[in-house]
Design a protein with these regions (language model features):
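Acidic, serine/threonine-rich low-complexity disordered tracts
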Residues: 17-127, 193-299
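Hydrophobic alpha-helical segments and helix pairs
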Residues: 122-165
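Sec-dependent N-terminal signal peptides
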Residues: 1-9
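C-terminal motif of bacterial Sec signal peptides marking the signal peptidase cleavage site
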Residues: 11-16
């Protein structure tokens, strides 16, 4: 059937699959990107515009960590999808929540991540994730703190379902990060970050960041996010056809705490949600989705 469950713009990393010939992927029911190998995905460049430079004193916001800086942090993600086709019963296609403890180590190329024991309330995925201990990931970073590439190298025995879950979690985190402006700013500063989120539907994501408070190198930043499709057509994966986009509304907000001496946020969360309506141009079947994604950082 043409209708396929995907969270547009949030599962693009995991849905850029091969030709579907891997029997292990079929058994797991999920086929991640780059099966069995390390994969690196470039992240679209962010364009940053300062709206208000804020109060004096002002200074450039730049990461100031040294090579070899180590940070222990935990990433938590939760991705919920409710879907209805025509007048059929609403179905739940949510991804299980993940808690990902990790150790980040900086080097000249960015940030290397070693994952600890990933946990989830879903029993089947929890069992699959036991083999993922020691999985490595990484971010390549710009001088403005933006993430320019995402790497994932799973532990050898990681199943496809576990790998796909990790890919989606990190992809969500990448597009909930913040890039700093290229000019001095102070408390109260507002800047806008515009970025394309790739996928079956390319999204124009605009993040408005507000510097709420600063204590030395520690920054409290408010984030407000909106996403709009760049096209009115959704190209389904694996050449399954297209859907017309009839309605699309995704927005959200949150607060994060950043230490300029560390590579990743030390605290905070951001939630994005909304609804999407698609129509099959061949059959006039209508697909409705309600989506909510939560990403948080902490100890």
């Amino acid at each position: 059937m043409l209708m396929v469950v995907l969270a547009v713009g949030l599962t693009a990393f995991g849905s850029g699959c091969g030709d579907g010939g891997d029997s292990g992927a079929e058994a797991d029911g999920t086929e991640p990107l780059g099966i069995g190998n390390e994969v690196t995905v470039p992240i679209a460049a962010a364009m940053v515009t300062t709206v208000d430079p804020g109060e004096e004193p002002r200074s450039l916001l730049r990461p100031s960590y040294y090579n070899g800086t180590i940070q222990a942090v935990t990433l938590r993600t939760d991705h919920r999808i409710q879907q209805q086709i025509d007048s059929q019963q609403v179905r739940d296609f949510s991804s299980p929540a993940l808690t990902i403890p990790m150790t980040a180590t900086t080097d000249s190329g960015g940030v290397e991540l070693t994952l600890g024991s990933v946990t989830t309330p879903d029993p089947a995925l929890s069992e699959a994730l036991t083999a993922a201990d020691g999985t490595h990931a990484g971010f390549e970073m710009s001088e403005l703190g933006g993430i320019t590439a995402l790497r994932l190298a799973p532990a050898p025995d990681t199943s496809n379902s576990a790998r796909a879950a990790l890919e989606q979690a990190f992809y969500q985190a990448v597009y909930r990060s913040v890039t700093f402006p290229d000019e001095p700013v102070g408390v109260g500063a507002v800047w806008r970050v515009q970025q394309t989120v790739g996928g079956g539907v390319d999204l124009d994501q605009v993040t408005t960041a507000t510097l709420v408070a600063r204590d030395g190198g520690r920054l409290s930043i408010r984030l407000d996010v909106t996403q709009t499709p760049k096209s009115n057509i959704w190209d389904l994966p694996n050449e399954a056809g297209t859907l017309d986009i009839e309605d699309y509304a995704m927005q959200g907000s949150g607060d994060i705490t950043v230490d300029l001496g560390l590579p990743l946020p030390i605290a905070g969360s951001i939630s994005i949600g909304g609804h999407q309506v698609y129509r099959d141009p061949r059959t006039s079947t209508v697909l409705r989705q309600a989506i909510e994604t939560n990403v948080s950082w902490g100890g």
